[in-house]
Curated annotation (Swiss-Prot):
This is GMP synthase [glutamine-hydrolyzing]. Its main location: cytoplasm. InterPro entries: Class_I_gatase-like, GATASE, GMP_synth_C, GMP_synth_GATase, GMP_synthase, GMPS_ATP_PPase_dom, NAD/GMP_synthase, Rossmann-like_a/b/a_fold. Homodimer. The gene is GUA1. The keyword DNA repair does not apply. It holds the Pfam family GATase.
Length: 525
């Protein structure tokens, strides 16, 4: 958050209390799609410590049983807010448990599609809805109506699929409206937020720009200066442009060329940010320093840590060279944190097990005694992209595929050398170039080439060769939690493979990775 004033105090907000469901973040996403601001907090949130009043409250699903000894329960103060409440799956069972304990194990678990039968279509929650497919994911069920409630919807296995309090705007549903499998789920969520909570649909990036610029100016004040690392990716570019709009040249961006960036990346980023966007940028070539520390290292986790630690060292050293004018002082560090990062840190089930170390600049705060400023921390990725376009950032940059913090170092499997990096980045450049020529770039979520630590026999002209292997990867995904490989035409892969083998010295063979996530991860390392 950029300044002391919370976004939830500036826009009508729906509070989503998370009981640990894998779908909880989708509730927030769906409401944002209707231009309604929604904020997710753990189910243990004390209402007295909230600091703002929501227009409505949604209780998410969760993997627990409400009757278990260690089951999480909501602060009963939500009922004193006198705002509409919607319980989803576990959230409905929580409402029932509080009002009569009519919850227990079901005769059979219910996972997958079911048919919702609306029996009271006069109720505003189901306005515009009829019998439809909904997504179930529960083992417990209501064994009777909680005190003061009536039934408004059923399914074949759930006689209490939808319930409502007879005198208060408190609703419960057994299914998950937030997932796409519930065909009219979006309608239900909109009915709740707009018709029942009367939340204004004014959460737009157009409104956010002015609000956030004012917050930044209040926080930074008229004299303090800000530094931040940029990578050429959408998050750091949007954050940097927003900061520049707010405080001008008092923001200092630093691009560290670590020797494992994409082909011509440093030069291209400098041209875009300085000439195109007017960002005050320093480019530091530390490629030899990074590559020397990576010499002989093959373990991917060690690569990530070496690059992360070296980055902090280089960034600190270069930041000390910045001398603000008129006795001004650098007091803040800009970071492009997004809302999914915030959700992961505050989710009731806590941060998930670390599969790979993520590259960030968290260590800089303690070392440099700076305060953190995160202007994008309330935004999802799609909102950041929209914001970037409104700020005049080129379309190609705004919709660029993700690139890992450790860069090509984790796309060169095995030891990272200057020569190996060059092979990988040239192959990657050809691959992305052909994807764009074919008009496929925006259909693919992420694509890249990586260099394998094996050699293969080949024939070039009349000569036998024994060179390296490139693996191509392209995936489709909506959330990067799961992903499927992209089904290229064979003719496209043939063209890319031919170009790479003929134009990149040291490559004898090209393969295409057709592994989904899971079991594989998106990156090879």
């Amino acid at each position: 958050m950029a300044a002391g004033e919370q976004v939830s105090n500036m826009f009508d907000t729906i509070l989503v209390l998370d009981f640990g469901s894998q779908y909880s973040h989708l509730i927030t996403r769906r409401l944002r799609e209707f231009n309604i601001y929604a904020e997710m907090l753990p189910c243990t949130q004390k209402i007295s410590e909230l600091g703002w009043t929501p227009k409505g409250v949604i209780l998410s699903g969760g993997p627990y049983s409400v009757y278990a000894e260690d089951a999480p329960h909501v602060d009963h103060a939500i009922f004193d807010l006198n705002v509409p409440i919607l319980g989803i799956c576990y959230g409905m069972q929580e409402l029932a448990w509080i009002n009569g304990k009519q919850v227990g194990r079901g005769d059979k678990r219910e996972y997958g599609p079911a048919t919702l039968k609306v029996i009271d279509d006069s109720n505003s929650l189901f306005k515009g809805m009829n019998d439809s497919t909904v997504w179930m994911s529960h083992g417990d069920k209501l064994h009777g109506l909680p005190t003061g409630y009536k039934t408004i919807a059923t399914s074949d296995n759930s006689p209490y699929c939808g319930i409502v309090h007879e005198t208060k705007p408190i609703y419960g549903i057994q299914f998950h409206p937030e997932v796409t499998h519930s065909t009219q789920g979006k309608t239900l969520l909109k009915n709740f937020a707009v018709d029942l909570c009367h939340a204004k649909q004014n959460w737009t990036m157009e409104n956010f720009i002015d609000t956030e610029i004012n917050r930044i100016r209040k926080l930074v004040g008229p004299t303090a200066e800000v530094i931040g690392a940029v990578s050429g990716g959408v998050d750091s570019t949007v954050a940097s442009k927003l900061m520049t709009e707010a405080i001008g040249d008092r923001f200092h961006a630093i691009l560290v060329d670590n020797g494992v960036l994409r082909l011509n990346e440093a030069a291209n980023v400098k041209k875009t940010l300085v000439e195109g966007l007017g960002i005050n940028l320093m480019v530091v070539d530390a490629s030899e320093e990074f590559l020397s520390k990576l010499k002989g290292v093959t373990d991917p986790e060690k690569k990530r840590k070496i690059i992360g630690n070296t980055f902090i060292h280089v960034f600190e050293r270069e930041a000390e060279k910045i001398k603000p004018k008129d006795g001004k002082e650098i007091q803040f560090l800009l970071q492009g944190t997004l809302y999914p990062d915030v959700i992961e840190s505050i989710s009731f089930k806590g941060p998930s097990q670390t599969i790979k170390t993520h590259h960030n600049v968290g260590g800089l705060l303690e070392n440099m005694k700076l305060k953190l400023i995160e202007p994008l921390r309330e935004l999802f990725k799609d909102e950041v992209r929209h914001l970037g376009e409104l700020l005049g950032i080129p379309h190609d940059l705004v919709w660029r595929h993700p690139f890992p913090g450790p860069g090509i170092a984790i796309r060169v499997l095995g030891e990272v050398t200057k020569e190996q990096v060059e092979i990988a980045r040239k192959a990657d450049n050809i691959y992305i170039e052909e994807i764009k020529k074919a008009g496929l770039y925006n259909q693919i979520s992420q694509a890249f080439a990586c260099l394998l630590p094996v050699k293969s026999v080949g024939v070039m002209g009349d000569q036998r060769t024994y060179d390296q292997v490139i693996a191509l990867r392209a995936i489709e995904t909506t959330d990067f939690m799961t992903a499927d490989w992209f089904p290229f035409e064979h003719s496209f892969l043939k063209k890319v493979a031919s170009r790479i083998v003929n134009e990149v010295d040291g490559v004898a063979r090209v393969t295409y990775d057709i592994t989904s996530k899971p079991p594989a991860t998106v990156e090879w390392e």
